[in-house]
C-alpha cells in the first residue's frame, strides 16, 4: 500500500497517510499535484513518497462542503514545478547563459542561481556515477526545469529527482532505451502514427516587411532536416515559425531545431501493468509495437502521471 508522508510548514515530518487520493504529473507540462485527504495540512508543507520522485509543496486548499461533510483537496507544485517556476537569465551584459563541466557541479550552480539551493542537493548519479555536460547554451529566459531537461537531453542524459532526509536530490544519468526487449504483454499503449508531418518550416526573424530575415528549412520522408527540399505538391506541409529579433545565424539554428522537434513519429500513451516491474523516467525512449497492425512508434517519455486511489498506485506515461 502506498504511504504518503506529510510535513508541517517547516518541513518536519508529521504523519504517514494511507487513506488519500493523489493525482500528480510532471514532465512536458502540468508539474503539479492534487491531493484529497481528510486532514488539515499547512500551506507550504511538503508531501512525498520517501526515496521517490513524486512529491511537492502544498500551495492551495479547496474546501467542498456537502451534506455537512467537508472534502479537502490540496493543490501544489511537484519538485519539478518548483524548478519550472524559476527563470534562467543570462548574466548581465551577456546574450546567453552557457555552462559546461561535471553534471552535479553544473546543476548545483544552476539551482543556486535560481535560489533553490535550500531545497535541492545536486549529486552524482547513484547508479551511473559522475556525468559530464559539454558546453551547452540555454535559450534566453527559459524556465529552469525545461532548461535542465534540454541540457541533459543534449548530452544523452535525463534529469532525476528523489526526496530523502529532508532534501530533494537532483542528478543526471544516461537515458535508458527500451526497445524490442519489452514484452508487449507488460504494457498497453495508444499510439498515433503520423506519416506526414510539417516538412517545410519558414523561419521569420528580425526586421519588417520586405526587410525581414527569412529562412527555409525542409524535412525529407525519413525526417532528416536540411535546407534542401525533397517533398513537394500534396506531400509538402508548410508552417511558419515566428522568432522575432533573431539574426540569420540564430534564426537558422532555431528553425532547424523546431522542424526537428516536429518530426516526431507520433504520439504514445503508455500504461505499464502493475506487476511488470518496468519503470520509465522522463527522457527515456520506448518502442511501441502492435503485431496486428504492424504499427511501430519510437517515442521519448515526456510526461509521468502518478495516481493513488484506495491505496493502489498506478503510473501512466505520455510520450512523443
Give residue spans per PLM region.
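Short beta-strand and beta-hairpin "edge-sheet" elements
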Residues: 47-75, 160, 287-312, 317
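Short beta-strand-centered interaction patches in the first periplasmic/extracellular domains
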Residues: 66-71, 78-81, 121-207
Amino acid at each position: 500500500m502506498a504511504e504518503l508522508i506529510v510535513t508541517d510548514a517547516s518541513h518536519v515530518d508529521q504523519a504517514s497517510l494511507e487513506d488519500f487520493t493523489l493525482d500528480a504529473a510532471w514532465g512536458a507540462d502540468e508539474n503539479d499535484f492534487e491531493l484529497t485527504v481528510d486532514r488539515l495540512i499547512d500551506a507550504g508543507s511538503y508531501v512525498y513518497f520517501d526515496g521517490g520522485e513524486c512529491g511537492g509543496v502544498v500551495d492551495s486548499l479547496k474546501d467542498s462542503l456537502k451534506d455537512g461533510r467537508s472534502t479537502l483537496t490540496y493543490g501544489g507544485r511537484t519538485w519539478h514545478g518548483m524548478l519550472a517556476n524559476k527563470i534562467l537569465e543570462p548574466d548581465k551584459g551577456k546574450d546567453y547563459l552557457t555552462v559546461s563541466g561535471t553534471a552535479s557541479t553544473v546543476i548545483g550552480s544552476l539551482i543556486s542561481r535560481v535560489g533553490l539551493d535550500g531545497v535541492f542537493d545536486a549529486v552524482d548519479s547513484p547508479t551511473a556515477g559522475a556525468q559530464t555536460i559539454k558546453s551547452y547554451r540555454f535559450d534566453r529566459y527559459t524556465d529552469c526545469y525545461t532548461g535542465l531537461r534540454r541540457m541533459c537531453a543534449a548530452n544523452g542524459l535525463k534529469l532525476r529527482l528523489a526526496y530523502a532526509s529532508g532534501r530533494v536530490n537532483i542528478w543526471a544519468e544516461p537515458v535508458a532505451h527500451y526497445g524490442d526487449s519489452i514484452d508487449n504483454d507488460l504494457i498497453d499503449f495508444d499510439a498515433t502514427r503520423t506519416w506526414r508531418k510539417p516538412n517545410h518550416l519558414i523561419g521569420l526573424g528580425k526586421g519588417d516587411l520586405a526587410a525581414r530575415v527569412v529562412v527555409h528549412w525542409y524535412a525529407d520522408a525519413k525526417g532528416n532536416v536540411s535546407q534542401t527540399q525533397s517533398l513537394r505538391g500534396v506531400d509538402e506541409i508548410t508552417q511558419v515559425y515566428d522568432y522575432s529579433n533573431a539574426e540569420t545565424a540564430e534564426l537558422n539554428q532555431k528553425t532547424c531545431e523546431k522542424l526537428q522537434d516536429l518530426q516526431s513519429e507520433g504520439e504514445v500513451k503508455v500504461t505499464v501493468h502493475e506487476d511488470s516491474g518496468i519503470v520509465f523516467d522522463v527522457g527515456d525512449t520506448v518502442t511501441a509495437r502492435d503485431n496486428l497492425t504492424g504499427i511501430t512508434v519510437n517515442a521519448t517519455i515526456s510526461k509521468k502521471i502518478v495516481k493513488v486511489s484506495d491505496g493502489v498506485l498506478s503510473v501512466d506515461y505520455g510520450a512523443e
